[in-house]
Amino acid sequence: MKKYLVLVLVVLIILGYVLSKKETVLAPVVENSKPISLCFYAQKLGVNGLSDVAWLKMNLLGDKVTGEFRNIPGEKDKKVGTFEGTVSKVDPYMMGRTADVWWNSMAEGMQVKEQLKITFGEGNAQAGYGEMVDRGDGVYVYKNPDQLTYGISMTDVACDDVRLAE
C-alpha cells in the first residue's frame, strides 16, 4: 500500500512539473496602421456680407496626428498650412481630446512654424488662439498656453466635402 501511495505521489509531482512547463502562446497585438481621418468645417457670414471660413483635416494614428488647417477670415488675410504633433487621450471632463501640433502656416507671403492647440470631440473642433512669442529660433509658441481663446466652432463633415470647399 505504501508503494502505491509513493508511486501516485511521484506521478502527481511529474505531472505537475510537466503541466507547469507548458508555454503560454499569446496572440500578437495588432496595431491599427491605418490612420483615422477626421474633418471639420465652418462658415460664418459677417455683417459686411463676407464669410469667415475655417476647415480642418486631421489624420490620427495612435497618439500622433498630422493634417491641415485653413483659417480664411472674410476681411483679413488667410492663414493656411499643414501640421504634425501629438494628441491626448479623451478628457472625461470635456469628452474630447486636444491636439498639440506644430503648424507650418503661410500668411501674407510668409511661412512660419508655430504652436497650435486644437480641441475636438462630440462632433466639433476649435483652434486655440493667444499671444505668440518667438522662442528664439524663429518658431512661435503661445506666451500663455493656459489662457487661449478658442475660435469658430467647426462641425464634423465628410472629408470629401472639405476638399470640395477649397
Predicted segments, located by residue:
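N-terminal glycine/threonine-rich, aromatic-flanked beta-hairpin/loop signature
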Residues: K57-V87
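Short beta-strand segments that buttress and anchor functional surface loops
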Residues: L38-V47, E68-I72, D100-M106
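Beta-sheet ligand-binding and adhesion/scaffold domains
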Residues: K64-T66, Y93-E166
